[in-house]
Amino acid sequence: MTQVLFYGCLFITFSPILAFFFMVIAKNSQLVILTIGGSFFWLVSILIAAIWWYIIPPMREHWWFIISFSVLFQEIFRYIFFRLYSYGFNDRPSLNQIKETQHQMALDSMRKRKQAQQQKQQPPTNEIESINNEIIDTTNNNTNNNNNNNNNINDDDNKEITEEEKEKRKIEKQKQREIEINARLETLSARPNHTLSSAAIGVGSGVAYGFIMFGSILWESTGPGTLFSPACPSVNLFMLSSIITLFMTLLHVVYNVLAFQGYRSKKYHLVAFVIITHFVTTYLTLLNLPTKTTSCVGSILPIGIITVFSVGFCIFSLLKSDSITKIH
């Protein structure tokens, strides 16, 4: 029975977010890197909150005090990650842009070289007048020499044309090779849109939250016997924690998408919504403590309602701003 409980809680908690990861994020290497970065920044924020909890003794006895700082550090690092993301994806050129710039520079240099060769072939105006005077003064005996000179000039033009064709063919081959390389490395060079990028970062934060906050509790379910929630003696503690962790992991994805959209488009009411609901849902978990006035229903039901509302609000805001299809 303990193994069934373990795998049941495991699949309930991580199935939705891992399904989204393998079906959407794992197909693009940049999204995978962003997911790892989201996990790292969330772990750093929790590490700083733990240090803060350790160096201030009064915080060890009051959960509401440490929760406020924990949420605050998470939001600060979310904004720091957004600044890094905006610098790396907006202010820096992509691989395709770099290749296109190099190709354009090669074409410009070839065009300048061609213009310089044409200027060398054209004599000055004074020389043209003197040549015309000499042609008028010359006799018919010089016609053969002029024909020979014209033939030599035509030969030189043919040589120059062949050299230009060789350069064009060389550049075309190089461009074709670059197109083939970009086609093979499409997942590397393709830049995902902002919505997928922010969702990938949120998935990283949610997975890290699930494994850190619920992993140790879930492992205890493999032991003999079972535990019940102090706030609801008839409810299994592992199942209750699994459902709450499921809601929180989904909220991490939604919070990151809304916060990044708010920072990017300067819609700060989205950022305010994220911060307020993050505080509310985190404080609602305190209702699971063993006190006379708490109840697990008062915790899990509001968190579930907030999760459903937040997901709907996130989809509505994305469709309204057309952020799902925008790349830049």
UniProtKB/Swiss-Prot annotation:
Domain of life: Eukaryota
Example of a GO cellular component annotation carried by this entry: endoplasmic reticulum
Transmembrane residue ranges: 5-25, 36-56, 62-82, 199-219, 235-255, 270-290, 299-319
UniProt region (Disordered), positions on chain: 106-175
One Pfam entry name: Aph-1
Membrane topology label: Multi-pass membrane protein
GO MF entries: protein-macromolecule adaptor activity
Role: Essential subunit of the gamma-secretase complex, an endoprotease complex that catalyzes the intramembrane cleavage of integral proteins such as Notch receptors precursor protein. It probably represents a stabilizing cofactor for the presenilin homodimer that promotes the formation of a stable complex.
Oligomeric form and interacting partners: Component of the gamma-secretase complex, a complex composed of a presenilin homodimer, nicastrin, aph1 and pen2.
Name of protein: Gamma-secretase subunit Aph-1
Organism of this sequence: Dictyostelium discoideum (Social amoeba)
Gene expressing this chain: aph1
